[in-house]
């Protein structure tokens, strides 16, 4: 007796279909740009509303924004140091807020209401292009911080405490952006796929605990990325001991 193939609902889940914009010979990932612009617009709107008519004793949205500001300031100060953290606070804050809003937006915003010719919108951080770009920005910030502070003496850290460490230090510079980008990308993509499969299989109650866990891990991933970014910048600024 031949077995008939059963149309499993989760077979509709596909990865790999994307919307591309062509500018000359350059192809841009349109889905990432669109979702990023939407989330940045939401973030800017929240900030503008929360900072309008600020009071000495904050309440409501202003209170939340001041809490986030103090939280990000502590991350930067603890890892970069009291002397230099103010210069890097906008960079660290931008990374944290963009990743946090992207992760939560990917889980909470009903992206399917936006119809595209191909593919669908989702969390920008679930795309490897976004996470690699941010990781490379952190690497550039690390080198800029070190070279602007120490000049060519910055490269002494590659041969400290002994020149034997040179190849290992060079390998480390490649593993930093790789670990930053793939950790964030893997966690967010896995969460979206897991929730998507569960929604197709049992669309009512079962996916809720997984979604709540995903929101928690998404916030943790934003914290880890911002903490490591500030740590790397602090490492470039301070003298090796």
Swiss-Prot record:
One of its GO terms (cellular component) is proton-transporting ATP synthase complex. Pfam families: ATP-synt_A. It is a multi-pass membrane protein. Its main location: membrane. It comes from the Bacteria. GO terms for molecular function: proton-transporting ATP synthase activity, rotational mechanism. Keywords: ATP synthesis, CF(0), Hydrogen ion transport, Ion transport, Membrane, Thylakoid, Transmembrane, Transmembrane helix, Transport. Key component of the proton channel; it plays a direct role in the translocation of protons across the membrane. HAMAP family: ATP_synth_a_bact. Belongs to the ATPase A chain family. This is ATP synthase subunit a. The gene is atpB.
């Amino acid at each position: 007796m031949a077995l008939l193939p059963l149309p499993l609902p989760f077979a509709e889940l596909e990865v790999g279909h994307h919307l591309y914009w062509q500018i000359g010979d350059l192809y841009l990932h349109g889905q990432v740009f669109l979702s990023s612009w939407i989330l940045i617009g939401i973030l800017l709107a929240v900030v503008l509303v929360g900072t309008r008519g600020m009071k000495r004793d904050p309440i409501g949205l202003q209170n939340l924004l001041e809490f986030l500001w103090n939280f990000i300031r502590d991350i930067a100060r603890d890892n970069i140091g009291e002397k230099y953290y103010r210069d890097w606070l906008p960079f660290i804050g931008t990374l944290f807020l963009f990743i946090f809003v992207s992760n939560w937006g990917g889980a909470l915003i009903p992206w399917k209401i936006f119809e595209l010719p191909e593919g669908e919108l989702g969390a920008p951080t679930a795309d490897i292009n976004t996470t690699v770009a941010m990781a490379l920005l952190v690497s550039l910030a690390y080198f800029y911080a070190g070279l602007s502070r120490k000049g060519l003496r910055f490269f002494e850290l590659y041969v400290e405490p002994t020149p034997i460490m040179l190849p290992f230090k060079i390998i480390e510079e490649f593993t930093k952006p790789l670990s930053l980008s793939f950790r964030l990308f893997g966690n967010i993509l896995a969460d979206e796929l897991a929730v998507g499969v569960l929604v197709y299989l049992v669309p009512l109650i079962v996916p809720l605990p997984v979604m709540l866990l995903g929101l928690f891990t998404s916030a943790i991933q934003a914290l880890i990325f911002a903490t490591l970014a500030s740590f790397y910048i602090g490492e470039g600024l301070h003298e090796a001991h």
